[in-house]
Design a protein with these regions (language model features):
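Active-site neighborhood of phospho(di)ester-bond hydrolases with catalytic His/Asp-centered motifs
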Residues: 65-66, 94-98, 124-130, 152, ...
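Membrane-embedded segments
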Residues: 60-147
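C-terminal segment of N-terminal export signals and the immediately downstream linker at the start
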Residues: 12, 31-63, 75-77, 84
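Active-site-proximal beta-strand elements of phosphoester/diester hydrolases
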Residues: 59-69, 162-170, 192-196, 250-255
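Conserved beta-sheet core of the metallophosphoesterase superfamily
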Residues: 198-273
Length: 280
């Protein structure tokens, strides 16, 4: 009897010890993964049918970079790696969907300098993100002067005959005027719509277009069985990354490159998005 009881207690102690060892090992593994993932840029590639895209532009290559957050939480090496891989793909067009710095204007110049290896034949088009609005005009100017980025702030540009890029101010920190942004576009134009915050897609759900966004970091820390964390300004929005349909518009949310709040990513590596556009 005593022996049986003692064996049972010993087994229970062993099981508890094993449980804590496994739990500790899992925690260490997740922490290690969180430290590693911010340094490993994942490339996602898609063929995307764009309504009203001229057939002469079928196969156009577009790279999307978003949320580099140059600052103390995102190593420059990660941003440079994303830029290097984008440049190696030789895109026809690069679109930048905001949050170039964490907060500090002093990071804008170095951030713009890191974009200079990109030389797409149709140029680089950018919008601002909510983190850029402490110094929006100065950050936009740095990106234009140093890297040649054409910044859209409730505006649109025809980058090739019959193909446009429209972009709005940030939905949290900026003053959005989507009517002004879309005013230059013919009703039958093929176009991409740039909105830092994915909620901006609601403003173009009546138009046939592809919308590109960032802001979410894909949740940044994605633990099994735990709902992802949505950043400010997305209350009630049903999607945190990937593709979705909103009326006539299709939306892609990139996980972005950088980090905020924590220098960690878990089950959510940084992303470079490469899109090959197809005439529909």
């Amino acid at each position: 009897m005593n022996f049986v009881a003692q064996s049972k207690n010993t087994t229970m102690r062993t099981n508890r010890r094993r449980f804590f060892q496994l739990s500790a090992g899992g925690a260490v593994g997740l922490f290690a993964e969180g430290l590693i993932e911010p340094f490993t840029v994942e490339i996602t590639r898609f063929d995307v049918r764009v309504p009203n895209l001229p057939r002469s532009l079928d196969g156009l290559k577009v790279a999307q970079l978003t949320d580099p957050h140059r600052g103390n939480l995102t190593p420059d090496a990660v941003i440079r790696d994303a830029v290097r891989q984008a440049a190696a793909w030789e895109p026809d067009l690069v679109v930048l969907t905001g949050d170039y710095v964490r907060w500090d204007f002093a990071d804008a110049g170095p951030m713009a300098q890191m974009l200079t290896p990109l030389k797409p034949r149709l140029g680089m088009i950018g919008i601002l993100g909510n983190h850029d609005y402490l110094y929006p005009n100065m950050i936009a100017r740095k990106l234009t002067e140093i890297a040649g980025v054409k910044m859209l702030r409730n505006d649109a540009i025809e980058v090739a005959p019959g193909f446009w890029i429209a972009g709005i101010e940030d939905t949290i920190e900026g003053v959005v005027d989507v009517q002004r942004a879309l005013a230059p576009l013919p009703l039958d134009a093929g176009f991409l719509f740039l909105t830092h915050n994915p909620v901006g897609v609601a403003m173009v759900q009546h138009r046939d277009c592809i919308a590109l966004a960032g802001h979410t970091h894909g949740g940044q820390l994605r633990f099994p069985g735990v709902p992802p964390h949505f950043p400010p300004g997305m209350e009630g929005f049903p999607q945190i990354d990937g593709w979705g349909c909103y009326g006539k518009a299709r939306l892609y949310i990139s996980r972005g490159i950088g980090c905020t709040a924590y220098p960690l990513r878990v089950n959510c590596p940084p992303e470079l998005t490469l899109l090959t556009l197809r005439a529909s």
